[in-house]
Amino acid sequence: MSKRDYYEILEVSATASEGEIKKAYRKLAMRYHPDRNPDDEEAEDKFKEASEAYEVLSDAQKRQAYDQFGHAGVDGSAGQGGFGGGGFADFGDIFGDIFGGGFGGGHRGPQPGSDLQYELEVSLEDAVAGTTVDVRIPTKELCESCDGSGAEPGSDVQTCPTCQGIGQVRVQQGFFAVSRTCPNCHGTGKLVKTPCKTCRGEGYKHSSKTLSVKIPAGVDNGDRIRLQGEGEAGEPGAPHGDLYVRIRVKEHKIFQRDGNTLFCDMPLSFATATLGGTMDVPTLNGKANLKIPAGTQSGQRFKLAGKGVKSVRSSHVGDMIVEVHIETPVKLTSEQKELLKAFDESLQGKHHKQHSPKTHSFFDSVKAFFKGDDEDGGNDKKDGPWN
């Protein structure tokens, strides 16, 4: 049967939490529940589709396989044996036994192929600049020997007498009549007496193919690229599914990214921070010159306009934020230590407040705090730099 992307079905992002997935399923299940939509086959199909998506995405192991290989990674584990199967044991905490089975349907036509999912890891540089990557994906195509029928050429394919070719059987469950996958034909609606020797009755052959995927500039973690018609083959007369390539950007040694903004931490010498100057800053397009004003403090941030990431949806280019961190000198010579001591002593005079405004402001605040305690009969004064 046709299988859309499970995240798309539940209307959630690929990074959705377990709670968000459960909430999304509950919303869709309530909307399309057969009891609320009697004799509405489209609603029944959407209910089944949402239930199958939830079965996979609510299971950590199945979700991991799906994220890596798409529907091919969970074939045979999702939606098999009707919705009353073991994979739906946790549905009871959402709606109870009312969701014990699947619902459906009339006669089925040729079903489009399943969508495929592929996770592609790219560097930050390639994500920002854009690139083209060749990927090799597993897929399945119609068997050329039997044209997808699953039967040995020249043999007959019979309509399943149990479900009359529908692929599902109606079962009474409490007050509801529900549909389950036909146990005789396993949902195919047909019976093959002499299986095709090439595909062993599957109707498909498993293979792989290499595709060139164009990565647009500005893609980010979780973005998806759709390649229409590059999914699995459908039943005879039906189109292929689609291929969804999900982007995962590698961590960078220098830059961090938030949307279209890049962040970079840079070491700064004590002398440059005090006296001012310039420094070379790495960007994704080479070096940029950053002016450092005198008196720069550790943790101070500077903006390099237009040095960030281009938006994937517009011509806007983000900025880069540089945060400087002043390095403390180590392994000083005796002469250097004496010079630093002399420098420090020179700051302790009457102009101390002018040279070290933050330190002086801090001690003023502490002094005022203890004076307030004394006025309220609090602690005695203690010796300290604020006295």
UniProtKB/Swiss-Prot annotation:
Quaternary context: Homodimer.
One GO CC annotation: cytoplasm
Binding of Zn(2+) 2, residues: C160, C163, C182, C185
Role, per record: Participates actively in the response to hyperosmotic and heat shock by preventing the aggregation of stress-denatured proteins and by disaggregating proteins, also in an autonomous, DnaK-independent fashion. Unfolded proteins bind initially to DnaJ; upon interaction with the DnaJ-bound protein, DnaK hydrolyzes its bound ATP, resulting in the formation of a stable complex. GrpE releases ADP from DnaK; ATP binding to DnaK triggers the release of the substrate protein, thus completing the reaction cycle.
Gene Ontology BP annotations: chaperone cofactor-dependent protein refolding; DNA replication; protein refolding; response to heat
Family: Belongs to the DnaJ family.
Zinc finger motifs (CR-type), residue ranges: 130-208
Annotated Zn(2+) 1 binding sites: C143, C146, C196, C199
Subcellular location: Cytoplasm
SMART domains, sorted: DnaJ
Superkingdom to which the source organism belongs: Bacteria
Organism of this sequence: Hydrogenovibrio crunogenus (strain DSM 25203 / XCL-2) (Thiomicrospira crunogena)
Cofactors required: Zn(2+)
Encoding gene (name): dnaJ
Record keywords, A-Z: Chaperone, Cytoplasm, DNA replication, Metal-binding, Repeat, Stress response, Zinc, Zinc-finger
Protein name: Chaperone protein DnaJ
Pfam families: DnaJ, DnaJ_C, DnaJ_CXXCXGXG
Cofactor note as given: Binds 2 Zn(2+) ions per monomer.
